[in-house]
Amino acid sequence: MYAIVRSGGRQHKVAVGDIVEVDKISTAQVGDTVELSTLLVVDGDAVTSDPWVLAGIKVQAEVVDHHKGAKIDILRYKNKTGYRRRQGHRQQYTAIKVTEIPTAAK
């Protein structure tokens, strides 16, 4: 059984017990439980994608860690003018562990 969930403008395929990195959830502390909105639930041969049914289904996950991703370097350069700009960025992530995927009511 797995589900497709939406978090931070991205979609993730998750199953119970998976640890997934999502964009930082600033309101959640380590150990808190968060709910993720569901776009699709697959349970064996049963596929649920109806938005009216999925509106009541929320995937439960536990916050495991907050951390930063790898640093990326942004360089801008224009030849013959001496124009150079350097910038770095580290995206902040939240690691969550999926604890429950409820099934659709039949």
From Swiss-Prot:
This protein binds to 23S rRNA in the presence of protein L20. Part of the 50S ribosomal subunit. Contacts protein L20. Pfam families: Ribosomal_L21p. This is Large ribosomal subunit protein bL21. It comes from Streptomyces avermitilis (strain ATCC 31267 / DSM 46492 / JCM 5070 / NBRC 14893 / NCIMB 12804 / NRRL 8165 / MA-4680). Coiled coil: none annotated. One of its GO terms (cellular component) is ribosome. InterPro entries: bL21-like (IPR028909), bL21-like_sf (IPR036164), Ribosomal_bL21 (IPR001787), Ribosomal_bL21_CS (IPR018258). Belongs to the bacterial ribosomal protein bL21 family. Signal peptide: none annotated. The keyword Iron-sulfur does not apply. One of its GO terms (molecular function) is rRNA binding. Keywords: Ribonucleoprotein, Ribosomal protein, RNA-binding, rRNA-binding.
